[in-house]
Amino acid sequence: MTTSPELVTGKAFPNVVVTGIAMTTALATDAETTWKLLLDNQSGIRMLDDPFIEEFNLPVRIGGHLLEEFDHQLTRVELRRMGYLQRMSTVLSRRLWENAGSPEVDTNRLMVSIGTGLGSAEELVFSYDDMRARGMKAVSPLAVQKYMPNGAAAAVGLEHHAKAGVMTPVSACASGSEAIAHAWQQIVLGEADSAICGGVETKIEAVPIAGFSQMRIVMSTKNDNPAGACRPFDRDRDGFVFGEAGALMLIETEDSAKARSANILARIMGASITSDGFHMVAPDPNGERAGHAIARAVHLAGLSPSDIDHVNAHATGTQVGDLAEAKAINKALCNNRPAVYAPKSALGHSVGAVGAVESILTVLALRDQVIPPTLNLVNLDPDIDLDVVAGKPRPGDYRYAVNNSFGFGGHNVAIAFGCY
């Protein structure tokens, strides 16, 4: 009787690698500059000067807007047909393709998986206001395709003629990571050879600020110190700060990458998706299923808990969330103490895009063998037993890393990466 190979990377699963990245954040319009500024202890969180802050007297007046608009990078026809998220995803996908060396691929084997959290909800509100003011004729015949949740992924699929599937995970703050996880799964199952994957998110707007603020426990109101407001793992943390972003990566089989002499940045080795089944907006305080996602991603990568040298933490800066994640990490990795980084301290929280942003940061940490410092960590919470990198960058021998993403609704995603 023949024994089937174990379903892990390097045995039954093919090796998958990262060969391109593109990102725009509140710090910079590209991944490399964002990375350099993070290593230099810089923050993208600033005072917001949007008119709606004063109009609605919002209690949160800080956040991180992007440093660019996309309109001038698109044609008049594209602008007429695309909503904001489609514009972002299209521009990022073009940058990604260039970063990856403008590869010639079999489009029948190319897929797209791009998540979003809040999507185009605000644009729908604005369209409704127009219709109330000017009647049905105010609504464009292109409205549905511009604002449908899968629009950003669909636009990229059409741009690159992808025919191996187009996916749009909508799982709150885990959407970007879940999109990458699904892409990896499709590749190792033989459904695709390459994937454009990641996450995009809408602009900082009034209703999301108001909605999260009304919850009172999740958003920081340290308006007098924007850069110091988000304090992951700190004893005195009081919530997250919004920071706009979008991020995409190209992943493909190692065989495909080698065949075209691609510049390989890292390995993507395992991914796991679980759910808490606990509460709509609060994580399971024990971190049970989040920990299982981490452990499962490590197992699928063909690794042991002791192999993990670095964890890019979801760590939004809330009291309950950071503590639950610390428990999840410790449950999954046993006695191992990897170097932990919390990028939302510098970039803010980009909801549906953030998992993709932080996946790229994990790739860059493995590529450059250095981890940026977590900002604003003055007094580590005594209940959090983690080795959090703070103060200055930490060089090291980082072979394998895990990126965590968790979202409202009990979504948990963990992705295991390896240096190349």
From Swiss-Prot:
In terms of Gene3D superfamilies, this protein maps to:
3.40.47.10
Record keywords: Lipid metabolism included? Answer: yes
Q: Which Pfam families match?
A: ketoacyl-synt, Ketoacyl-synt_C
> Which one GO biological process term can you cite for this protein?
fatty acid biosynthetic process
InterPro entries to which the protein is assigned, alphabetical: Beta-ketoacyl_synthase, Ketoacyl_synth_C, Ketoacyl_synth_N, PKS_Beta-ketoAc_synthase_dom, Thiolase-like
Q: Which family does it belong to?
A: Belongs to the thiolase-like superfamily. Beta-ketoacyl-ACP synthases family.
Protein name in UniProt: 3-oxoacyl-[acyl-carrier-protein] synthase 2
Q: Which organism is it from?
A: Mycobacterium leprae (strain TN)
